[in-house]
A protein has these predicted regions:
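Flexible C-terminal active-site loop/helix
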Residues: 337-424
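Catalytic core of soluble alpha/beta enzymes
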Residues: 192-345
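Short glycine/serine- and small hydrophobic-enriched flexible loop segments
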Residues: 132, 136, 323-327, 349
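Short, Gly/Pro- and small/polar-rich lid/capping loops
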Residues: 1-35
């Protein structure tokens, strides 16, 4: 099945407020819609561009618009590179495209040390379109049929409930926080690593966490083994040394918060190769994971969980990383990457098939689109089969029955409303 042509469209989704994390903030979400055509079928994939998350150096060197345009050009490069080829599978295509896209992006951004996450993020829309073509070619109609044999053991769970983790950014509405905490099913993913020097960051993080713990720390939680609310802290690589992180942990211990920490995600810059197995909390890897070798290296350094991002680093790479973590007995979880409804199903399908983390009675999925996008309701309505359909009435959980596990959560359908820009 040879790819004969491609098309690309860009959509800019407005946010309710700036999304602040990793020492910066962005004000709108850019999405690429990628169309790949063969003689037999058409695949349309959406990719959400995450410049600040994937490489802050690009974000800092350009305007918000400029950084997004650079990543969109990498997506265009990858789609064009596929024309005239006949990849055996999406995974084979991504394996070939990733080094090419990374080299192109390094030259484009003039950053020799550009993080591979930038290139992976640019490939998401291309990969999603490839999976639609793959399904059409082989007559596949469910997500279970998409899972390659090598990843089936890693994705053998069948969660019927996922706790939805909203991202609590620096500017999150405290009134909304209180409402969520009262639900009894609240697991906040708190963005730490405030802007400023390391000392300023630490002081602001300590103050903010003290405030949050006083506000919601006693809230009940029906998802944890001991009934207490748990916290998920995400530093996005802002802590430059183990000493600074230990000072934060000492503060959390003093205020009685430490034993309610489920995990801390990506505390150090990805070039930091420190051992973390001696820390008193579970440490998860995220941005520093680009392939299975990175998964194995982080596990060797004591990282206790691997964060997967089907909608941030491609489904193809997610399958490979999930299998690598499972082979070494290390749990995995799924994070959101600011998904619009049309992208949510890609993450939801993976999260629903991972075992629960230690201390949890069900699965989890970070999903912050509801709090982030101005037009969330309209976007969810437009793509009626998307993952947002499974949100509970109070929006704290995804309720997943047998019908969900027998389907695909909309990922094999044209991603409305974005398909209109490339389907003519």
């Amino acid at each position: 099945m040879t790819i004969q042509s491609c098309d690309l469209d860009i959509v800019r989704e407005p946010l309710l407020r700036p999304f602040a994390f990793k020492g910066g903030a962005f004000t709108e979400k850019w999405l690429t819609a990628v169309c790949l055509r063969t003689a037999e079928a058409t695949g349309i994939g959406v990719g959400g561009l995450a410049i600040l998350w994937s490489d802050p150096a690009v974000f800092g060197a350009h305007t918000e618009t400029g950084g997004n345009l650079l990543m969109a050009l990498v997506t265009e490069f990858a789609a064009q590179a596929l024309v005239g080829t006949s990849p055996a599978s999406p995974m084979e295509a991504v394996q070939t495209l990733l080094p090419q896209a990374h080299e192109y992006a390094r030259n484009l951004t003039r950053l020799p040390e550009l993080r591979r996450t930038f290139a992976l993020n640019a490939l998401v829309g291309v990969d999603n379109a490839l999976w639609q073509l793959h399904a059409a070619r082989h007559g596949l109609t469910t997500f279970n049929q998409l899972v390659p044999d090598f990843a089936k053991d890693a994705l053998c769970a069948r969660q019927h409930r996922l706790v939805r983790l909203p991202a609590i950014t620096y500017s999150f509405d405290d009134a909304r926080l209180a409402v969520l905490a009262e639900s009894g099913c609240f697991l906040p993913k708190i963005k730490i690593g405030h802007p400023g020097t390391q000392e300023e960051m630490l002081a602001r993080d300590c103050a903010r966490l003290t405030e949050l713990h006083a506000q919601v720390g006693c809230a009940p939680a029906d998802y944890s083994d001991d009934g207490r609310l748990l916290y998920y802290l995400d530093a996005n690589g802002r802590y430059e040394s183990g000493d600074t992180l230990r000072r934060l942990l000492d503060h959390l211990d003093r205020i009685g918060m430490l034993d309610q920490i489920l995990l801390i995600e990506e505390p150090f810059p990805e070039e930091n190769q420190s051992e973390v197995g001696d820390l008193p909390v579970m440490i998860a890897a995220d941005e520093s994971l680009h392939d299975v070798d990175d998964v194995r290296r982080r596990i060797g350094q004591g990282y206790g969980a691997m964060t997967l991002k089907a909608a941030g680093k491609t489904l193809s790479m997610t399958f490979a990383m999930a299998a690598a973590a499972h082979a070494r007995g290390v749990p995995a979880l799924v994070a959101d990457s600011g998904c619009v409804p049309a992208l949510l199903g890609w993450n939801l399908n993976v999260a629903a098939r991972l075992p629960s983390l230690p201390g949890m009675s069900c699965g989890i999925l970070e999903s912050n689109g509801l709090e982030s996008y101005r037009n969330w309701a309209e976007l969810a309505h437009a793509h009626a089969t998307c993952g947002a359909h499974f949100l509970s009435r109070d929006t704290t959980t995804f309720e997943l029955g047998d019908a969900f596990h027998a389907g695909h959560a909309g990922i094999l359908d044209p991603p409305k409303p974005y398909a209109a820009g490339v389907s003519a």
